């Protein structure tokens, strides 16, 4: 079985590739898997089958033979998907993406410290501290992200059902229970209602056996299983049962024809684990961002390295400067900020029923431009419900309310009494025990979906069905089978002590053929042409709504011929099944979930295309698509246009039709180009009767258009598509383990509407990360410029390394994280999905705003404070220029200031460190304004308001921390930070105000002139 795959699937790609043979081989194997299942066991006669598997069809295998086959084939279990070892996951967190930048910074710091230690007698330890702190930051955040992902994968593991499955096999003529893993090819296996099918079986005998194939094919109706070969395609034929589907009723015997990975289910699981997964958009964004920052850092570093050499510094000093500038450019706190932002959003989404398995998927959902959604259970409730009935020549809507307040017809009608009696009696579904206190619509039933729907409908409108059945005991029955397409039962009548009533339901046209009269207003009248036309119209109308229609009829058996105690023979029929009395039609549908139409509308206004992909019938699919708004009102398909204009479909220009329903069998014969054509030209698309492999091809088609695709699914059949999509969304309640394994996110309530919440959260996190990064990067400029002036103008160093760390890992952290809590701006779900090519997380405009505009104002504020303090101490700006070498000379203890006072080395250093502290305080003051302007990208702060409590806490926290670092006793020794005069705090205030006013004016122009020059240059 192939594992690993090419990124792009097209038949042409495999031949065109001349790359390594191994890759081609893998692609070829995966293409094989993408093709439909090939097997011929369903075509063999029973004798040929016995010969092929060397098995006696009545006694089963011998124990010896079973052991040999088990040794040859291995246990009957799916190979678990290749998992990443924990240490690899941990290393990825430690060395992936952003961490690399910090590691390089740390190594450069140790290098610089090494050079200084070799050159100087008393080297300063700044670089050593910085290196250690950087390494610590990476390790702590790495552990944090690893813990987060491990936690959500723990939740994943709890989904796996740990019970070892049992299977009933017959070996050497004895029935025995064994673990399903020990079942081998050729085993004779029995399954009954409620069992999971232990392997792929070829049925050799069955009694009313029905299986639920929905996890494999997506069909919600149970499928009949019998020994007859009915279809070329093994997935459609009746005589094959598939591994891990459920048997819902009846019993069957079969020969095992495939086990483990060789089963149809196994092939799909292998296909899913073999697909290569692309990188998440946010990972690419962070990489792009690292390249940008590194570019800026290296450019600055190298230019000042050259400059310092020109200015006459020694090589070694120049290298120290180079390293210093590069490290000053590294935003140390940003890694932690990004991780915390993603984690917070993941937690917030979990509260809204979206469990995110890997943190980066949170953002992917926000950039989604196409959602391919499954129908059954995601858009619909996965609960068949009676929708309409037709009797007395009128269509009535069914009343599904608990208190029957929505009745649309007179319940006293004798025809309705007859119809409800047939629906309740000719019905094998029952409520499971102990649910008397639960509302009827929520109760669990045993029986197939349509019968359960009828049961609930009759229970609601006529009271207890069980009592009705007790009053009319069943004496004979013919279960539904696909040849005669009806179900019949005979009951003793409660209203006459001697006679019986025969009740029948089934496919409407078959039922009508057996009737000669029809019940209208409680009277039997002949079934004439007029009534047949009325029936036909009602049948077509209900069928066109995508509903499953059943016909009902009855016959009161004459008591003379069929007295009580009469032996009805259901094999050799000894009672009439013709000339019955037609009573009415009832139609059922799996109704859309209540919140879905609204959610689809939100997707549309957010520029997201919703495509329905289902295994169900095209008419049903189209009806639901219209019901939930995937096909919006007034939009027509080619068929609709042809019907309206009364012309053949070939004459309609397909481009005129906005909507389109594609049948799986047509999709099979399409080339990639034709599929692309459909995806390009139609805005509203429904794919019906699709196979799992086709789902994958549809996803790849959307990705070829450059879309970011989200796929929802619950069945095993969805797992390849879930894996291939940019974000796979599995269902938490109805989803199979395989689909949960392949997905990136799990909807705990199975509701499509939760996806829209997810999209909003994803867009919000992208916006908020942008804001966080803009905020964090801005303070880089006031941190770097002091260093540059120190080199160029030869002034005493205005801001030290330790104080830079106090900003990046101290005061800036909480405010940066608080932006993750910022509420969405008003246009968040009205924008088009972001284009991953042009709309980057960090773009040139963001860098120019943070570095070139706001950052420069901040730096001015810091230098203003610096020059004020030195001037107050007697060093005017003119005296400072070129003073650096004397200032830093330990032997010089009589340096004169502008007024002729002499300063010792120790005294000078205390003033210098006080300046560091004041510069630090000024940065905190200007970062207040920066934090407030970063709250919004387009709206005014006054529109947005200050509702973000965490942000207000962040403002207070950074101020308190700055004051603590300045005034706490002992800081002078520990971090060389000294207490400041109160007035020095206010030096930067005007600059803070300037930043706020400057940005509010900019945003006003943005809103007044959208698309103008200001937007092009400054909107990040």
Curated annotation (Swiss-Prot):
Keywords: ATP-binding, Cell membrane, Disease variant, Epilepsy, Intellectual disability, Ion transport, Magnesium, Membrane, Metal-binding, Nucleotide-binding, Phosphoprotein, Potassium, Potassium transport, Sodium, Sodium transport, Sodium/potassium transport, Translocase, Transmembrane, Transmembrane helix, Transport. The chain crosses the membrane at residues 86-106, 130-150, 287-306, 319-336, 770-789, 800-820, 841-863, 916-935, 949-967, 983-1003. The modification Phosphoserine is found at residues 10, 439, 450, 496, 559, 587, 672, 826, 940. Changing residue 874 to S: In FHM2; some patients exhibit a clinical overlap between migraine and epilepsy. Signal peptide: none annotated. It is found in: Membrane; Cell membrane. Its EC number is 7.2.2.13. Residues 107-129, 307-318, 790-799, 864-915, 968-982 are extracellular. Its main location: membrane. InterPro entries: ATPase_P-typ_cation-transptr_C, ATPase_P-typ_cation-transptr_N, ATPase_P-typ_cyto_dom_N, ATPase_P-typ_P_site, ATPase_P-typ_TM_dom_sf, ATPase_P-typ_transduc_dom_A_sf, Cation_transp_ATPase_P-type, HAD-like_sf. The keyword Heme does not apply. One of its GO terms (biological process) is L-ascorbic acid metabolic process. Pfam families: Cation_ATPase, Cation_ATPase_C, Cation_ATPase_N, E1-E2_ATPase, Hydrolase. Changing residue 887 to R: In FHM2; loss of function. Changing residue 593 to Q: Found in a patient with generalized tonic-clonic seizures; likely pathogenic; decreased sodium/potassium-exchanging ATPase activity. Residues 212-227 have a biased composition (Polar residues). The sodium/potassium-transporting ATPase is composed of a catalytic alpha subunit, an auxiliary non-catalytic beta subunit and an additional regulatory subunit. Interacts with regulatory subunit FXYD1. Belongs to the cation transport ATPase (P-type) (TC 3.A.3) family. Type IIC subfamily. This is the catalytic component of the active enzyme, which catalyzes the hydrolysis of ATP coupled with the exchange of sodium and potassium ions across the plasma membrane. This action creates the electrochemical gradient of sodium and potassium, providing the energy for active transport of various nutrients. It is linked to Migraine, familial hemiplegic, 2: A subtype of migraine with aura associated with hemiparesis in some families. Migraine is a disabling symptom complex of periodic headaches, usually temporal and unilateral. Headaches are often accompanied by irritability, nausea, vomiting and photophobia, preceded by constriction of the cranial arteries. Migraine with aura is characterized by recurrent attacks of reversible neurological symptoms (aura) that precede or accompany the headache. Alternating hemiplegia of childhood 1: A rare syndrome of episodic hemi- or quadriplegia lasting minutes to days. Most cases are accompanied by dystonic posturing, choreoathetoid movements, nystagmus, other ocular motor abnormalities, autonomic disturbances, and progressive cognitive impairment. It is typically distinguished from familial hemiplegic migraine by infantile onset and high prevalence of associated neurological deficits that become increasingly obvious with age. This is Sodium/potassium-transporting ATPase subunit alpha-2. The lineage of its organism: Eukaryota, Metazoa, Chordata, Craniata, Vertebrata.
């Amino acid at each position: 079985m192939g594992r690993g795959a090419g990124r792009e699937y097209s038949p042409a790609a495999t031949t065109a590739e001349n790359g390594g043979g191994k890759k081609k081989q893998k692609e070829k194997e995966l293409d094989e898997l993408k093709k439909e299942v090939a097997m011929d066991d369903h075509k063999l006669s029973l004798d040929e089958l016995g010969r092929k598997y060397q098995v006696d069809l009545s006694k089963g295998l011998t124990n010896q033979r079973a052991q040999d086959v088990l040794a040859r084939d291995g246990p009957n279990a799916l190979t678990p998907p290749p998992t990443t070892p924990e240490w690899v996951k941990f290393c990825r967190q430690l060395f992936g993406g952003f961490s690399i930048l910090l590691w390089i910074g740390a190594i450069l710091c140790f290098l610089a410290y090494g050079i200084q230690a070799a050159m100087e007698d008393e080297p300063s330890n700044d670089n050593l501290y910085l290196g250690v702190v950087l390494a610590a930051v990476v390790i702590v955040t790495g552990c944090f992200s690893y813990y987060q992902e491990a936690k959500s994968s723990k939740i994943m593991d709890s989904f796996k059902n740990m019970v070892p499955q049992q299977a009933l096999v017959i070996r050497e003529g004895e029935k025995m229970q064994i673990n399903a893993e020990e079942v081998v090819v050729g085993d004779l296996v029995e399954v009954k209602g409620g069992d999971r099918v232990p392997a792929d079986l070829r049925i050799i005998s069955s009694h009313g056996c029905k299986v639920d194939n929905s996890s494999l094919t997506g069909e919600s109706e149970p499928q009949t299983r019998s020994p007859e070969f009915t279809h070329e395609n093994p997935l459609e034929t009746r005589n094959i049962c598939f591994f891990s589907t459920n048997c819902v009723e009846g019993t069957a015997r079969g020969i095992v024809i495939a086990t483990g990975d060789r089963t149809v289910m196994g092939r799909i699981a292998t296909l899913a684990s073999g697909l290569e997964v692309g990188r998440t958009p946010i990972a690419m964004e962070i990489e792009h961002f690292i390249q940008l920052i590194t570019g800026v850092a290296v450019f600055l570093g190298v230019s000042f390295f050259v400059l310092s050499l020109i200015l006459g510094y020694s090589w070694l000093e120049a290298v120290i400067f180079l390293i210093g500038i590069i490290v000053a450019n590294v935003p140390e706190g940003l890694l932690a900020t990004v991780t915390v932002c993603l984690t917070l959003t993941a937690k917030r989404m979990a509260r809204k029923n979206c469990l995110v398995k890997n943190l980066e998927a949170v953002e992917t959902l926000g950039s989604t431009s196409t959602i391919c959604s499954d129908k059954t259970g995601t858009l619909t409730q996965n609960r068949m419900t009676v929708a309409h009935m037709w009797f007395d020549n009128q269509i009535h809507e069914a009343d599904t309310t608990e208190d029957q307040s929505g009745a649309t017809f007179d319940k006293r009608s004798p025809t309705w009494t007859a119809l409800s009696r047939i629906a309740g009696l000719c019905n094998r579904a029952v409520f499971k025990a102990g649910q008397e206190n639960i509302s009827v619509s929520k109760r669990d039933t045993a029986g197939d979906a349509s019968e359960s729907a009828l049961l609930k409908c009759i229970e609601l409108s006529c009271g207890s069905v069980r009592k009705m059945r007790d009053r009319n005991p069943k004496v004979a029955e013919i279960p539904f089978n696909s040849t005669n397409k009806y179900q019949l039962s005979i009951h003793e009548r409660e209203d006459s002590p001697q006679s019986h009533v025969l009740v029948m339901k089934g496919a409407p046209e078959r039922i009508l053929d057996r009737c000669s009269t029809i019940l209208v207003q409680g009277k039997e009248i002949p079934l004439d042409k007029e009534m047949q036309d009325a029936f036909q119209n009602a049948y077509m109308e209900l069928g066109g709504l995508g509903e499953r229609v059943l016909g009902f009829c009855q016959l009161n058996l004459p008591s003379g011929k069929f007295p009580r105690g009469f032996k009805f023979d259901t094999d050799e029929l000894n009672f009439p099944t013709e000339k019955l009395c037609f009573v009415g039609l009832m139609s059922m549908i799996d109704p859309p979930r209540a919140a879905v139409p609204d959610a689809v509308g939100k997707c549309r206004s957010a520029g997201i295309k919703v495509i329905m992909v289902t295994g169900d019938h095209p008419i049903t699919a189209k009806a639901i698509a219209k019901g939930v708004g995937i096909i919006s009102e007034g939009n027509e398909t080619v068929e609709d246009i042809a019907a309206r204009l009364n012309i053949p479909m070939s004459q309609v220009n397909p481009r005129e039709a906005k909507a389109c329903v594609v049948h799986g069998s047509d999709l099979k014969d399409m080339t990639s180009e034709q599929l692309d054509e459909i995806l390009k030209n139609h805005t509203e698309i429904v794919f019906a009767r699709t196979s799992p492999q086709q789902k994958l091809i549809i996803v790849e088609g959307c990705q070829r258009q450059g879309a970011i695709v989200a796929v929802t699914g619950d069945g095993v059949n969805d797992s390849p598509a879930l894996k291939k999509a940019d974000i796979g969304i599995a269902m938490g309640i109805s989803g199979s383990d395989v689909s949960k394994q392949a997905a990136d996110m799990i909807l705990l309530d199975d509701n499509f509407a939760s996806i829209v919440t997810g999209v909003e959260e994803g867009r919000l996190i992208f916006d908020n990360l942008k804001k966080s990064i803009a905020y964090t990067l801005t303070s880089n400029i006031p941190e770097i410029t002091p260093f540059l002036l120190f080199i160029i103008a030869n002034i005493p160093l205005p801001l030290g390394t330790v104080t830079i760390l106090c900003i990046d890992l101290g005061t800036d952290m909480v405010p940066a994280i608080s932006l993750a809590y910022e509420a969405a701006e008003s246009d968040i779900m009205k924008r088009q999905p972001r284009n991953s090519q042009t709309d980057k997380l960090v773009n040139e405009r963001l860098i120019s705003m943070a570095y070139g505009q706001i950052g420069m104002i901040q730096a001015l504020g810091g230098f203003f404070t610096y020059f004020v303090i030195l001037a107050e101490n007697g060093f005017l700006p003119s005296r400072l220029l070129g003073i650096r070498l004397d200032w830093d000379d330990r032997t010089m203890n009589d340096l004169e200031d502008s007024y002729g006072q002499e300063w010792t080395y120790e005294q000078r250093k205390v003033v210098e460190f006080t300046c560091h502290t004041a510069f630090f305080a000024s940065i905190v003051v200007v970062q207040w304004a920066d934090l407030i302007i970063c709250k919004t990208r387009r709206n005014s702060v006054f529109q947005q308001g200050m509702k973000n409590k965490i942000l207000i806490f962040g403002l207070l926290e950074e101020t308190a921390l700055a004051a603590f670092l300045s005034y706490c006793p002992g800081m002078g020794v520990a971090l060389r930070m000294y207490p400041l005069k109160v007035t020095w705090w206010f030096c930067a205030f005007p600059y803070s105000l300037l930043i706020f006013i400057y940005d509010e004016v900019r945003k006003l122009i943005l809103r007044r002139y959208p698309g103008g020059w200001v937007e092009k240059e400054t909107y990040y």
